[in-house]
């Protein structure tokens, strides 16, 4: 609550990492409900993301979709598209919500699968590019975004050619070392913007009694830096 109250004027979105609530059992679920209810009641203009990375067979995905997008009323949820369109469809069936599909993630292990090349006659492509090509028509830019790691700016222009009008959620800036200048230069275009995520560098800006003020300063610094870049 203190973090939200101190940083909201510098944010367009809050990404709630559900694992840090779920690991606490029923108490954690209650805390997550309190968090999203507080955001929806006090800051309804701020876009909320359930960073849950769900995705399963259709009837199970429907339960996940109902849990986060209906019952908890998040604006969006991160989804793993690995199981295909029928695992994603239940999330898309809920009106006025977004799914955020994993495409190219910021972790070093993304090279193990996402950056593998697929060779076909007269075509060589990365796995992540095939994921985008396959999934971009499951929904459209009014209900689908993509996760693209801020530590991989060399692939942004390639991705923008594939999905010029989809919002990108870009983690990896801040504690993971992504360069905001390179992110903005390569991921933004005249069609649509981006959501740049900075979590640990804001939340853990200080462990002292003034942690909320430190978080506000860290969030404001990010906002100021982005404003300078976008001038």
Protein language model features and the residues they cover:
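A general structural detector for well-ordered alpha-helical segments in enzyme core domains, enriched
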Residues: 3, 31-35, 64, 68, ...
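Conserved N-terminal beta1-alpha1 strand-loop-helix module at the mouth
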Residues: 1-47, 123, 143, 210-231
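Conserved anion-binding
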Residues: 48, 56-147, 165
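A C-terminal functional module that forms or caps the active site or interfaces directly
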Residues: 150-197, 201
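Active-site beta-loop-alpha junctions enriched in small/polar residues
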Residues: 19-21, 53-57, 82, 104-106, ...
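Active-site-adjacent beta->alpha loops and helix N-cap segments on the catalytic face
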Residues: 23-41, 57-61, 81-96, 151-161, ...
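Short helix-capping segments at alpha-helix termini
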Residues: 41-46, 138-141, 162-165, 188-190
């Amino acid at each position: 609550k203190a973090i939200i109250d101190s940083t909201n004027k510098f944010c367009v979105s809050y990404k709630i990492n559900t694992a840090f609530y779920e690991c606490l059992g029923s108490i954690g679920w209650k805390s997550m409900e309190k968090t999203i209810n507080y955001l929806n009641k006090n800051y309804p203009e701020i876009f909320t993301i359930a960073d849950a990375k769900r995705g399963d067979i259709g009837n199970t995905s429907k339960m996940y979709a109902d849990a986060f997008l209906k019952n908890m009323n998040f604006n969006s949820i991160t989804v793993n598209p690995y199981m295909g369109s029928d695992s994603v469809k239940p999330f898309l069936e809920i009106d006025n919500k977004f799914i955020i599909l994993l495409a190219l993630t910021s972790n070093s292990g993304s090279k193990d699968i996402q950056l593998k090349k697929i060779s076909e006659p007269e075509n060589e492509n990365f796995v992540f590019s095939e994921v985008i090509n396959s999934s971009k028509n499951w929904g459209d830019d009014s209900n689908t975004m993509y996760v693209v790691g801020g530590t991989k700016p060399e692939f942004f222009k390639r991705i923008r050619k594939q999905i010029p009008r989809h919002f990108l959620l870009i983690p990896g800036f801040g504690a993971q070392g992504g360069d905001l200048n390179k992110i903005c230069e390569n991921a933004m275009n005249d069609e649509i913007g981006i959501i740049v995520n900075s979590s640990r560098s804001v939340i853990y800006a200080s462990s002292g009694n003034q942690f909320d003020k430190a978080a506000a300063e860290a969030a404001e610094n990010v906002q100021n830096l982005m404003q300078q870049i976008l001038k």
